[in-house]
Swiss-Prot record:
Entry's family note: Belongs to the YqgF nuclease family.
NCBIfam families (UniProt xref): RNAse_H_YqgF
Name of the protein described by the UniProt record: Putative pre-16S rRNA nuclease
Organism: Clostridium botulinum (strain Hall / ATCC 3502 / NCTC 13319 / Type A)
Function of the molecule: Could be a nuclease involved in processing of the 5'-end of pre-16S rRNA.
Top-tier EC class: hydrolase
EC number: 3.1.-.-
GO molecular function: nuclease activity
GO cellular component: cytoplasm
Length: 137
């Protein structure tokens, strides 16, 4: 069984998957959001394909640790996922993951257009890898 990582935004959802042993995270795709039904179906397809038993979603907290409007949207969508897919969902503090992902892509000398296409997938990888690393401590 594998763990799925999500970076949920208003326009896209970055997706990452763990290896079967749960040691490493790999970005697999970015879903361009269309509707709740479409988004849930796309996530379900990925969960079925990889035999996912747990989902880790990034929770966008403010720098002082409080939850803002974007956090509420993410929590509501995660409740929908839980309802429709019956998969355990864990929340992971995603502060600065997009910043770290962008920095890594800049260091890799990726063009702006390439970075824009994959930043959410890379951020989902950072979220999931952080969670996986916490399990091994």
């Amino acid at each position: 069984m594998r763990i799925l990582g999500l970076d949920i935004g208003d326009r896209t959802i970055g997706i990452a998957i763990s290896d079967p042993l749960g040691f490493t995270a790999q970005g697999i795709t970015t879903i361009r959001r269309k509707s709740e039904a479409y988004d849930l179906e796309e996530i379900k397809k990925i969960c079925d394909k990889y035999e996912v038993d747990t989902i880790v979603s990034g929770l966008p907290k403010n720098m002082n640790g409080t939850l803002g409007p974007q956090s509420e949207k993410v929590l509501e969508f995660c409740d929908l996922i839980k309802e429709h897919l019956n998969i355990e969902i864990k929340m992971w503090d995603e502060r600065l993951t997009t910043v770290a992902a962008t920095r890594a892509m800049l260091e890799a000398d990726l063009s702006r257009s390439k970075r824009k296409k994959i930043v959410d997938k890379v951020a989902a990888t950072y979220i999931l890898q952080g969670y996986l690393d916490s399990l091994s401590k």
